[in-house]
Amino acid sequence: MPGRYKAPYFKVKRFTMKTITKAPILFRGGDYNPDQWLDRPDILEKDVEMMKKAGMNTATLGVFAWAKYEPQEGAYDFSWLRETMDRLYAAGIYTELATPCGAKPNWMAKKYPEILRVQANGVTDHQGMRHNACPSSPIYREKVHNIIEKLVEAVGDHPGLILWHISNELGGDCYCPRCQTRFRYWLRDKYKTIDALNHAWWTGFWSHHYNDFDEIEPPFENGEQSLLGLKLDWRRFTTWNMTDYVHSETELLHKLTPNVPITTNLMEYFPGLDYHYLQKELDFVCWDSYPHWGRPDRSITTTFAMTAFDHALIRGCKRDVPFFTMESTPSLVNWHEYNKLKRPGVNRLQGLQTVACGGDGVQYFQWRKGRGGTEQWHGAVVDHDGRDDTRVFKDVTETNAALNALTPVIGSLPRAEAALIFDWDSRWALEDAWGMQIQQKNLRETVCALHEQLGRCGVDADVIGVEESLDRYKVVVLPMLYMVKPGFGEKIRQFVANGGTVIGTYLLGYVNDSTLAWLGGFPGDGLREVFGVTATELDTLYPGEHNTVVFPDGSKAAIQDYCELLETRDNTDVLATYGEDFYKGYAVATHHAFGKGHAYYVAARMDADGNAKVFRAAMAQAGCTMQTLPDGVEYHCREDERAVYHFYLNTTETDKTVAVPTGADLLTGKTVSREVTLGRYGACAVEVVK
C-alpha cells in the first residue's frame, strides 16, 4: 500500500529558452487575463497592439480561467482562448499556458463538497479565494485531468504554445481525513515500525507515546504541538503530497505534449514547501519576485541584495538550467501593509539583476489591471485608464529594450566559486525550536547578509541544498544550518580534507534529521573535528542589545542576536574574541586547518565589517577571484562556451565608478575598459569573448 504513493518522477530534459522557442529570445511578458474582458473586443485588440509596442514577446494565459473554460460541468468553451493565442502569435508573442487548477469553479465545490480543504483548526473551508481544493482528492484530480485533456485537445497543437504553467503559487496544507490517512501511510513507509517513529519523535516527552500509526493525527492548532518531529514530518509530507499532486499534472502533460516543457511559479523564501523536492517535477524553475521596496527600515541596496539571494535560492533548485521570473510588478503591489511605488530606475535595474543572476526572462503581473476583485489596485503595465503613454508603460518599454540588448547571454549560466547551503528541513526545525529567539530566529536576515557578504567581495555564490555536489566550489558556507543530517558531516569533512574551504556559523549542527539533539557537543555529526571547536553554550541577545567582536589589530565590530561560547582545540587559530560580558575574551571567529583545506567558524551574528574580515581571509586562502567594489555595487557573472558576461549593478542613487574588464557593454553597444561610471540605478553588462 505505501509504495503506490511514491511518484515515478519524470526525467526532465535540459530545456533552455533557445530550445523552447527555437529562437534566441529573452522572455519579456506578463500575466494576461483576456477572459475578464470578453465583452470588450476593442480592448482585446488594443492589448496586442500595446504589448507589441511595449516590447513584449510572451503572455501567460488562463491562470484562473477554469470557470470560463468550463462554466458548467462537462460544458467547455475554449474558442476565446484559441482566438487570443492566434492574435498573440500573429504579433510575434508566444503563449505560456497555465493549467487553471489554482482555483476551482463554484459549481464544483457545490456538487463535490468533499474536495474542500480542511484547515489546521479542523474546520472545513467554504468555497472561496484560491488554493481551495484538497490536493489528495481523487475527484479533484479527475476534474484536473479532464480540463487538461480538453485544453490540450483545444490548443495543444498551437504553434504559439511554448510552455505549460502548472497551477499558480502552489501551497497550503489540508488536514482532511483523506490527507490524514495518506500521512499515516507516508509515516509507515518512512519508519516501518511504530517503535522507530516513537524514538525519532522522542514521544516519551510529556507521555505522548504512540501504540499504532492509526493514533497519529497531524499537528492541529488545538492538538499536538509539542512533538517537533511530528511537526517536521507533517511539513515534509505536505511537500510530498503537493509534489505528488503536481506529478499527476506533469505526467499527463508530458504524455500529451512531450515537447512542451513544464514549470510553475515558485515564491522566493516560501515556508510552505520544500522547493528542492518539488523541482523534481519541473523542467525548469520560475519564481514570483516581489521585493518590499521602500521600507523605511531597509535600504534599497539591502533589498536588492535580498533579491539576489532569492534569485540564487530559486536557481539553485535546478542549478544547470536558466530560470526566469514569472511575475513581478512594474510599479507596486497591493498586499503589503503600505504599498509604495517603485522609484524611477528601480524596475529597470530589477529586470537587469534577474538576468545578471542567471535568469532568461522577466515577466509582470499583471498586463492590465482588472476592474474588480482584490487585485484591482495591484500594479500593472496598463492601468485603468488604458493608456500607453504613462510613466509605468514607458518604464516597462525601456526596460524591455534593455533586456533585449542582453540576448547574447541567453542559455549561459552563473559562474560561482562559492555556495551557501540552505535546507528547508533545517529551516523548519529551527523555526519550530522552543529556544533561542522564540518568534524570530532571523535565519533569512542571516543567510541574505552572508550571501551579500560574498558579493561584496566580488564573488558570485550559489545557494544549494544539502544533497548537491560541492565539487565545483572553492568555498562553502553553512549559515545557521541547525539541522545536520547523518552523512552530511562526512560530506563536509571530505570537501575540506580534499582542499576546500568551509565557513560555519553559530547554530550549526544542533539536531539530526529527526530534530533530536546531536550528542557529544555541537556541531554534531563529526563537524567538531573539522572546525576544531565545540559550542558549549548559546546566549540570545534581546532586540537592541549588542556585544562587540575584537580583532587582533584592535578593530571592532558589532554583534547582535546570538553569541555562542566556544571551546577551541590547541591547533585552532582564534581570529577574533568577544569584547563584552562574562565571556569577554572567548573566541568569536576561528580558523582550523584540516587535511588539505581550511575550516572557519563564526560564533556570533557579526555586522558586515566583522564578516568582511573573516570572509575575505577565507576566500583569499581558497584562491577565489575577488574584487574591491564600491558600496552598493553588485557584481554577477555568467558564462557559456563563447564568452564571459560581467554584470555591474549600481543599487544606489549616487554615481559609482567600477573597474571592469575590456569588452563590449551589451547595454550601450560600446567598448569599455578599465573603469566605468554607473549613474543612479545604472548598470553595465560587459561581454568578454573567449
Which residue ranges define each predicted feature?
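Aromatic-lined substrate-binding rim segments of carbohydrate-active enzymes
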Residues: E45-A54, T60-V123, V152, E249-L256, ...
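Conserved, mostly hydrophobic/aromatic
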Residues: G30, M51, A59, L88, ...
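Short, acidic/polar
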Residues: W37-K53, V144-K150, M267-Y277, R343-G351
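N-terminal carbohydrate-binding accessory modules
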Residues: K13-T58, P71, D86, V409
